């Protein structure tokens, strides 16, 4: 587990730097994802492309982000790539990862999530599952989760009812600790919808993976939730349970990602060569751990509460 993901990541590092929302590079990355899936055994009828508009005038992105690479001509449209693997049940698990990046190599954020999802999609193509699995590669997360918001807004009532779980994989390469988050924070600060993440954590312990829940006692992010700024948020907003995979470092109460270098995401350190030189063995370990867990979660047939 994790070796195919690593090979995808090396390809992304070399070929798709600066895949900023709406740019040619973002579109090229979408084409790459489609080619992997079509060559990996999925039929064209399993795949859908969902286009949507993006508004470039409201970037949520941090001004400090270094645009190291030019992603080419920019437009105000982007797309999600949807792949459906039918299970015995119509009840569906969404596996999501955004494929756009800041103006960097974007291997941590979020070539890593894309690579783990692609590896899993190829592994599952001929694997019988109880639940239907839909892989969604979201465009344009960085400027404000445009892809996941468009996806959730497009769902029919029936489709919403059928989605029992969303697994979001975002920035799983460089952080010091491997985390799982979940749960919906209520207005009074209590947290609901935690059954899925706690079940996932039990599976982590059964397998013996070095993945943990975030530290308890953080007033800004009630346990076991994490930051809202990723593609699980629109699903959470409509009450769909989620499990969010992210490598980070919360040991001192705020997410610094790495003790040694601070944030890797959104900086020019988001580069596979740099990460491998700085953190020997971390890349393979992280990809392997999350790939193993994802496969195990999708083998379960009792996610409905």
Identify the role of each PLM range.
Residues 1, 13-27, 34, 67-72, ...:
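Second-shell loop/turn segments in exported
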Residues 18, 53-57, 87-89, 99-104, ...:
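Solvent-exposed loop/turn segments at secondary-structure junctions
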Residues 46-48, 80-84, 92-96, 134-137, ...:
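Structural recognition of the beta-strand scaffold that forms the well-ordered cores
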Residues 177-305:
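Active-site-adjacent substrate-binding region
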Residues 77, 101-195:
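Acidic/histidine-rich catalytic neighborhood of metal-dependent amide-processing enzymes
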């Amino acid at each position: 587990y994790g070796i195919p993901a690593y090979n995808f990541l090396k390809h992304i590092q070399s070929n798709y730097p600066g895949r900023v929302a709406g740019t040619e590079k973002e579109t090229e990355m979408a084409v790459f994802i489609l080619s992997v899936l079509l060559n990996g055994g999925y039929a064209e009828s399993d795949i859908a492309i969902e286009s949507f508009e993006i508004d470039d005038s409201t970037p949520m992105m941090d001004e400090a982000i270094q645009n190291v690479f030019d992603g080419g001509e920019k437009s105000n449209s982007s797309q999600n790539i949807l792949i459906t693997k039918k299970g015995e049940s119509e009840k569906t698990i969404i596996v999501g990862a955004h494929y756009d990046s800041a103006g960097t190599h974007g291997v941590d954020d979020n070539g890593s999530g894309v690579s783990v999802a692609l590896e899993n999609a190829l592994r599952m193509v001929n694997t019988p599952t109880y639940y239907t699995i839909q892989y969604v590669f979201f465009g344009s997360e960085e400027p404000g989760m445009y892809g996941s918001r468009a996806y959730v807004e497009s769902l029919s009532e029936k489709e919403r009812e059928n989605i029992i779980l969303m697994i979001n994989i975002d920035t799983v390469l460089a952080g010091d600790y491997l985390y799982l988050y979940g749960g919906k924070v209520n207005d009074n600060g209590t947290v609901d919808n935690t059954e899925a993440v706690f079940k996932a954590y039990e599976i982590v312990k059964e397998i013996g993976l070095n993945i943990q829940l975030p530290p308890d006692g953080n007033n800004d992010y009630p346990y076991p939730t994490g930051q809202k700024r990723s593609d699980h948020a629109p699903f959470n907003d409509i009450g769909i349970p989620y499990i969010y995979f992210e490598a980070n470092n919360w040991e001192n109460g705020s997410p610094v990602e790495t003790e040694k270098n601070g944030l890797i995401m959104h900086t020019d350190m988001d580069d596979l060569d740099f990460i491998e030189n700085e953190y020997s063995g971390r890349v393979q370990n992280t990809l392997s751990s999350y790939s193993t867990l994802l496969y195990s979660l999708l083998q379960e047939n009792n996610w409905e509460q």
